[in-house]
Every structure is written in structure tokens, then in C-alpha cells.
């Protein structure tokens, strides 16, 4: 009979977007409890060791973290399995580098470097808007933040721009047709486009129709859609490829053109 939380994760059961090889051991680092779900997060040890190659093993990652050199969303994190997730800003003090965790078109977290100005804020998708004790209104974002006294115009599925230094909302973007979005789940994960149409299904999943910069149309569930800007203007910089998924033939042609 299981008592308490699970503490281990077999390597083969780890999320595929962590891109761990099968033969380097039996176990994988298991994300701690935190702002993102295990299967939607990237532990700091994998980011520093496997992605950036700043450490050779877990012991070296711990040595880096214990010097309090790594910040996630402006807060020092010393837990090597802290779950960083979508839209989180990771800052490395010694190298002066800033990264934002966003998906590439293959559904993996891209190593996306950003400027100091962009590292000062993050976007949060509004999951819930409610009235709490003593009639105080509040909203909850996708990364577990509770923000009190929000603008009454902010509704569920809208996106808020959060200043990381104060934790306050500086602006927000409505979930509306014509706004630019990124897909955060499903087979179209990581693709970027503008909303063209929303199908409402009572008792089922609402479907959102999206058109990318090359006029390719695709659809996904409403829960997978994250608004990242108003109109065509994104509030964040996008990783290489700008969220445009090419077909296999288009990828081949692009490779050939590069070789020539």
C-alpha cells in the first residue's frame, strides 16, 4: 500500500520532451512538487546539465545551485529538481544569460535566450477568476500564482503580463479572434498563429481554429491555446522558426537550399 508521494521516476517513463537517452541509467530526476505539472515541466538539473552542458553530472549541478547563482522568475532556486515550465524565466547570474522556456514546433522546450528587458516579465494564462473571502476578487494563472484585485475586464483564458519584481499585473490581452497565440499541447504543440474562429461545444471541448504566418490552418482544444500578444504583435520573442511548422518536404527543401 503506497503511503506518501512518489519519489522516483524510471527513465523510460520520463516525458519524451526531456530527451533523455535510455542507456545512461535506470532512473530520471523526478520533478519536485511546484508551479508546473511533472509532465509539463523541465527540472533545473536537466536544463543545466543536458541542455546547456554547464555541468557534467548532478553533483556539479547541485554545486552551481548551492552558490545561489540560478534564479527562476526572479527567485533563487537551490533545488535541482525544481520544475521550471512554460513561460518561466531562468536567469544565470555568473554568465549574465536569461532564458525563457517556450516550446519549439516539435513540442520540446527550446533553449531560448532573451534580453534583460524581456527577462523582467512573464505571461500567465488565466485559469480561474473568483471572489474570495470578504469579497476580494482574485485570479489564478497557469503557473499557480494567485493575484488579488485584478482588472474586472480580465476573464478566463485571457493572458496577463506579470512584472516579476513586484508580482503585479502590468497589462493583459483578451482571448479574441485575430490575436496571436501559441499552442501548448496536442500534436500542434509549439505552433504559433492567429485565432480565426472558436467553436463552442456544450459539455465537450471548445475547438479553436488557428492560422499561422504561412496561411496554414490547424485546430486544437481551447485548453491548449495560450494568447501571447494582441493582433500579430507578440509580447515575447519567439524561438528559431517562429513557431511555423514545415512539412517534411518543406524541411527537405530548406535543408537543400542551405547546402547550396
Curated annotation (Swiss-Prot):
Residues 42-105 form the S4 RNA-binding domain. One of its GO terms (cellular component) is cytosolic small ribosomal subunit. CDD domains: KOW_RPS4, S4. It holds the Pfam family Ribosomal_S4e. The keyword Cytoplasm does not apply. Keywords: Ribonucleoprotein, Ribosomal protein, RNA-binding, rRNA-binding. One of its GO terms (biological process) is translation. InterPro entries: KOW, Rib_uL2_dom2, Ribosomal_eS4, Ribosomal_eS4_C, Ribosomal_eS4_central_region, Ribosomal_eS4_central_sf, Ribosomal_eS4_KOW, Ribosomal_eS4_N. Belongs to the eukaryotic ribosomal protein eS4 family. This is Small ribosomal subunit protein eS4. It comes from Yarrowia lipolytica (strain CLIB 122 / E 150) (Yeast). The lineage of its organism: Eukaryota, Fungi, Dikarya, Ascomycota, Saccharomycotina.
Amino acid at each position: 500500500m503506497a503511503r506518501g508521494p512518489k519519489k522516483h521516476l524510471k527513465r523510460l517513463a520520463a516525458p519524451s520532451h526531456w530527451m533523455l537517452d535510455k542507456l545512461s541509467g535506470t532512473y530520471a530526476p523526478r520533478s519536485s512538487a511546484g508551479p508546473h505539472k511533472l509532465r509539463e515541466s523541465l527540472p533545473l538539473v536537466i536544463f543545466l546539465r543536458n541542455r546547456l552542458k554547464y555541468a557534467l553530472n548532478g553533483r556539479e549541478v547541485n554545486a552551481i545551485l548551492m552558490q545561489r547563482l540560478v534564479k527562476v522568475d526572479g527567485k533563487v532556486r537551490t533545488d535541482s529538481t525544481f520544475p521550471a515550465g512554460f513561460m518561466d524565466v531562468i536567469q544565470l547570474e555568473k554568465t549574465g544569460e536569461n532564458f525563457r522556456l517556450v516550446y519549439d514546433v516539435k513540442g520540446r522546450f527550446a533553449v531560448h535566450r532573451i534580453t534583460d528587458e524581456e527577462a523582467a516579465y512573464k505571461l500567465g494564462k488565466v485559469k480561474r477568476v473568483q471572489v474570495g473571502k470578504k469579497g476580494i476578487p482574485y485570479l489564478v494563472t497557469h503557473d499557480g500564482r494567485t493575484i488579488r484585485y485584478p482588472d474586472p475586464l480580465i476573464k478566463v483564458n485571457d493572458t496577463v503580463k506579470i512584472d516579476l519584481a513586484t508580482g503585479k499585473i502590468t497589462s493583459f490581452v483578451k482571448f479574441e479572434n485575430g490575436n496571436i497565440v501559441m499552442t501548448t499541447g496536442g500534436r500542434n504543440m509549439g505552433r504559433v498563429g492567429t485565432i480565426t474562429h472558436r467553436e463552442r461545444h456544450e459539455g465537450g471541448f471548445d475547438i479553436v481554429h488557428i492560422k499561422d504566418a504561412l496561411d496554414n490552418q490547424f485546430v486544437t482544444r481551447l485548453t491548449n491555446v495560450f494568447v501571447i500578444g494582441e493582433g500579430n504583435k507578440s509580447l515575447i520573442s519567439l524561438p528559431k522558426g517562429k513557431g511555423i511548422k514545415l512539412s517534411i518536404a518543406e524541411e527537405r527543401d530548406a535543408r537543400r537550399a542551405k547546402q547550396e
